[in-house]
């Protein structure tokens, strides 16, 4: 009930007077501030100067900046040296390049392909052989017949390798044009360039040459060339040519036990230790225009010439590899051969003995 009681003031008696406490006026902060601000003009000026020296300067956004004496000079030699040391010890992470379906390796698992390594400076290929260039149907047929007769005379071998390549114009507006040039090489001393612009149909002698049972056509990504040739000239059967052709990139992966997809230029770097002048101006030139100029003819000839050189080199490596593997098995046994093979040995060079 106490909370409902109201305390009433007690009235003093008639004879008693209430004691009055002295009134003390409390100073509020504002009043104190006003009182402290009352200075003479000289004192106010001195106070302003002192505040300018003690308070930091204001930045653009009103933020107080650090005193100039305490600011660290980021351009000094010591700071740059510390930054370089820190970056070398902990290099910044880079976003890895994302592989797309077109750039992803289509080869089987194996040692990473040396084509991904930046090639060293190599001497450019110099072709000094003959270039036989034909544009008319009857001339192309006669030349193909001569090559076929030369193939028939190679009685000491079962297979005659022939480098094969094609060229055609390309436009970013209309895409690839019709197959315009076929170049072949059966001997490193002579290359044949056949321009197909005036041909509605391939000569029968040329079709017979590329389908000769003794001829082994080879190149880089050669299967795609055969499919395009069949689209442009239906008298050619791409499937029959694909069955007996050799893709130099795939063959290199089998022999050297590398991986990945190869270009002719990178394959020339790795196998032949030569550089190719793949000028975009020549590569994207008008291959359908007659006649071809000297740069175009040399470009076409070098493509099949270096292809023939690479084939011969891989052929020798394959033979030597088989010999080394056979000798190792005879000396160390099948179990040791499998163990060493599992460690990544390619047997491209001879191994005399092994300790397991």
Swiss-Prot record:
<feature type="modified residue" description="Phosphoserine">
    <location>
        <position position="105"/>
    </location>
</feature>
<feature type="binding site">
    <location>
        <position position="167"/>
    </location>
    <ligand>
        <name>Mg(2+) 1</name>
    </ligand>
</feature>
<dbReference type="InterPro" id="IPR012337">
    <property type="entry name" value="RNaseH-like_sf"/>
</dbReference>
<dbReference type="GO" id="GO:0006139">
    <property type="term" value="P:nucleobase-containing compound metabolic process"/>
</dbReference>
<feature type="modified residue" description="Phosphoserine">
    <location>
        <position position="113"/>
    </location>
</feature>
<feature type="compositionally biased region" description="Basic and acidic residues">
    <location>
        <begin position="72"/>
        <end position="92"/>
    </location>
</feature>
<keyword id="KW-0378">Hydrolase</keyword>
<comment type="function">
    <text>Has exonuclease activity on both single-stranded and duplex templates bearing overhangs, but not blunt ended duplex DNA, and cleaves in a 3'-5' direction. Essential for the formation of DNA replication focal centers. Has an important role in maintaining genome stability.</text>
</comment>
<protein>
    <recommendedName>
        <fullName>3'-5' exonuclease</fullName>
        <ecNumber>3.1.11.-</ecNumber>
    </recommendedName>
</protein>
<feature type="binding site">
    <location>
        <position position="165"/>
    </location>
    <ligand>
        <name>Mg(2+) 1</name>
    </ligand>
</feature>
<comment type="similarity">
    <text>Belongs to the WRNexo family.</text>
</comment>
<keyword id="KW-0597">Phosphoprotein</keyword>
<feature type="region of interest" description="Disordered">
    <location>
        <begin position="1"/>
        <end position="117"/>
    </location>
</feature>
<dbReference type="GO" id="GO:0046872">
    <property type="term" value="F:metal ion binding"/>
</dbReference>
<feature type="compositionally biased region" description="Basic and acidic residues">
    <location>
        <begin position="13"/>
        <end position="29"/>
    </location>
</feature>
<dbReference type="InterPro" id="IPR002562">
    <property type="entry name" value="3'-5'_exonuclease_dom"/>
</dbReference>
<keyword id="KW-0460">Magnesium</keyword>
<feature type="domain" description="3'-5' exonuclease">
    <location>
        <begin position="155"/>
        <end position="316"/>
    </location>
</feature>
<feature type="binding site">
    <location>
        <position position="303"/>
    </location>
    <ligand>
        <name>Mg(2+) 1</name>
    </ligand>
</feature>
<dbReference type="InterPro" id="IPR051132">
    <property type="entry name" value="3-5_Exonuclease_domain"/>
</dbReference>
<keyword id="KW-0539">Nucleus</keyword>
<dbReference type="GO" id="GO:0045950">
    <property type="term" value="P:negative regulation of mitotic recombination"/>
</dbReference>
<keyword id="KW-0479">Metal-binding</keyword>
<dbReference type="Pfam" id="PF01612">
    <property type="entry name" value="DNA_pol_A_exo1"/>
</dbReference>
<feature type="compositionally biased region" description="Basic and acidic residues">
    <location>
        <begin position="44"/>
        <end position="57"/>
    </location>
</feature>
<dbReference type="GO" id="GO:0005634">
    <property type="term" value="C:nucleus"/>
</dbReference>
<keyword id="KW-0269">Exonuclease</keyword>
<feature type="binding site">
    <location>
        <position position="165"/>
    </location>
    <ligand>
        <name>Mg(2+) 2</name>
    </ligand>
</feature>
<dbReference type="GO" id="GO:0003676">
    <property type="term" value="F:nucleic acid binding"/>
</dbReference>
<dbReference type="GO" id="GO:0008408">
    <property type="term" value="F:3'-5' exonuclease activity"/>
</dbReference>
<dbReference type="InterPro" id="IPR036397">
    <property type="entry name" value="RNaseH_sf"/>
</dbReference>
<keyword id="KW-0540">Nuclease</keyword>
């Amino acid at each position: 009930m106490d909370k409902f009681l109201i305390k009433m003031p007690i009235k003093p008696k008639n004879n008693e007077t209430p004691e009055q406490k002295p009134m003390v006026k409390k100073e509020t902060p504002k009043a104190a501030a006003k009182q402290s601000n009352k200075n003479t003009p000289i004192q106010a000026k001195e106070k302003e100067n002192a505040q300018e020296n003690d308070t930091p300067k204001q930045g653009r956004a009103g933020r107080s900046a650090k005193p100039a004496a305490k600011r660290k000079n980021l351009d000094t030699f010591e700071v740059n040296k510390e930054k370089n040391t820190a970056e070398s010890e902990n290099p910044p992470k880079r976003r890895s390049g994302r592989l797309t379906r077109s750039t992803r390796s289509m080869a089987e698992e194996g040692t990473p392909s040396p084509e991904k390594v930046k090639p060293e400076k190599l001497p450019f290929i110099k072709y000094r052989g003959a270039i036989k260039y034909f544009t008319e149907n009857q001339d192309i047929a006669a030349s193909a017949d001569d090559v076929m007769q030369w193939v028939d005379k190679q009685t000491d071998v079962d297979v005659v390798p022939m480098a094969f390549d094609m060229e055609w114009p390309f436009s970013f507006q209309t895409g690839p044009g019709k197959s315009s040039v076929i170049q072949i090489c059966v001997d490193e001393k002579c290359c044949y360039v056949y321009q197909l612009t005036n041909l509605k149909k391939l000569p029968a002698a040329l079709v017979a040459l590329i389908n000769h049972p003794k001829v082994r056509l080879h190149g880089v990504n050669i299967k795609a060339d055969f499919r395009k040739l069949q689209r442009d000239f239906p008298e050619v059967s791409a499937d029959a040519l694909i069955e007996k052709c050799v893709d130099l990139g795939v063959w290199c992966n089998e022999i050297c036990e590398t991986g990945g997809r190869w270009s002719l230029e990178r394959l020339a770097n790795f196998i032949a230790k030569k550089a190719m002048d793949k000028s975009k101006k020549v590569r994207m030139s008008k291959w359908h225009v007659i006649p071809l100029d000297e740069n175009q003819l040399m470009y076409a000839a070098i493509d099949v010439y270096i292809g023939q050189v690479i084939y011969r080199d891989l052929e020798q490596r394959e033979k030597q590899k088989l010999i080394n593997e056979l000798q190792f098995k005879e000396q160390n046994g099948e179990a040791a051969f499998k163990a060493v093979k599992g460690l990544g040995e390619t047997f491209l060079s001879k191994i005399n003995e092994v300790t397991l």
